[in-house]
A protein has these predicted regions:
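ATP-dependent carboxylate/phosphate-activation module, predominantly the ATP-grasp catalytic core
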Residues: 160-225, 236, 247-262
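Short, hinge-like loop/turn segments at secondary-structure boundaries
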Residues: 43-47, 102-103, 140-141, 175-176
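Conserved protein kinase catalytic/activation segment
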Residues: 240-242
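Flexible, glycine/charged-enriched surface loops at secondary-structure junctions
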Residues: 227-233
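N-terminal beta-alpha lobe that positions the nucleotide/phosphoryl donor
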Residues: 54-67, 71-120, 129-132, 139, ...
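ATP-binding N-terminal substructure of ATP-dependent carboxylate-amine bond-forming enzymes
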Residues: 1-95
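ATP-grasp fold ATP-binding core
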Residues: 104, 118-138, 153-169, 181-185, ...
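Short glycine/serine/threonine/alanine-rich loop segments
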Residues: 24, 109, 226
């Protein structure tokens, strides 16, 4: 009899498809419930707002009592039974981009400098959130004010703007050790609206600094306390790999990683 897994989060398709290919009976709680998700799961439930997610998970447990639970974006901090991967207590620090910045600095990782208001150009980003869709380069107090209104006045930080190639590393971690599985070049949306939104990936990353990035990622993953598959985002220049964020869960590049690794 096949084992079963509930995949829960804002978007779950990449993990659900992988689990189905591995032979699991898959159930999903997902914001979108698009056709290529519903085609591979035994049952699914949609939600609109993230505060509805815990109740949807409870309902799926009542229906199916899955053997395991895997959380994706938006569900990293939920306390759920039978959870696989990084615990909410370990993930919590990396859900705050300011705390992630401090973590990188503490362990001596190359990272864009944090800037104060009035220092431009700067990369503005909300302290919470995923996917990069609210990130923006601002060049004046006026641009910063307009951006802050766009993100509905959420807490934010400013970083030195490093021009380079967006990339990431997929790692496997045990809570104290880690290995880099694959490097990825990220595809961002571009254009005038949400230009830094994640839109896809190419694996492996062909950039000359990819091996340097993988070495740094292994150190980050080992020090992070995370468990299982995780992703670390970077910007690559001609001379350095700058760490940007930690995703303490399966990352959006999972599909290209699996295709590249076979």
């Amino acid at each position: 009899m096949s084992k079963s897994v509930l995949v829960a989060g804002f978007t779950t398709r990449h993990v659900a498809v992988s689990a189905a290919k591995a032979g699991y009976d898959v159930y999903a709680v997902d914001h979108f419930c698009d056709a290529d998700l519903t085609a591979v799961v035994k049952d699914h439930m949609a939600f609109d707002e993230l505060d509805e997610l815990p109740f949807a998970i409870e309902e799926m447990f009542a229906r199916h009592n899955p053997d395991f639970v895997v959380t994706t974006s938006g569900a990293e901090l939920l306390e759920v039974p039978k959870r696989l991967g990084t615990s909410p207590s370990a993930a919590k620090r990396f859900m705050d981009k300011g705390e992630t910045q401090k973590f990188f600095e503490e362990i001596g990782i190359p990272v864009p400098k944090e800037l104060g208001k009035g220092q431009y150009p700067a990369m503005a980003k909300t302290l919470s959130g995923a996917g990069g869709w609210r990130n923006a380069v601002v060049r004046s107090d006026e641009e910063l004010a307009a951006w802050h209104e766009f993100v509905q006045f959420e807490p934010y930080m400013l970083q030195e703007f490093v021009e380079g190639t967006p990339a990431s590393v997929c790692c496997l971690a045990t809570g104290g050790k880690a290995v880099a599985l694959c490097t990825n070049m990220q595809i961002l949306r571009g254009g005038d609206f949400c230009p830094y939104a994640f839109s896809g990936s190419m694996t492996p990353c062909p950039h000359p600094m990819a091996s340097r990035m993988a070495e740094i990622a292994e150190k980050i993953a080992a020090e992070s306390g995370c468990v299982g598959c995780m992703g670390i985002d970077f910007v690559l220049t001609d001379s350095e790999a700058y760490a940007i964020e930690i995703n303490p869960r399966f990352q959006g590049t999972l599909e290209t990683v699996e295709s590249a690794l076979g």
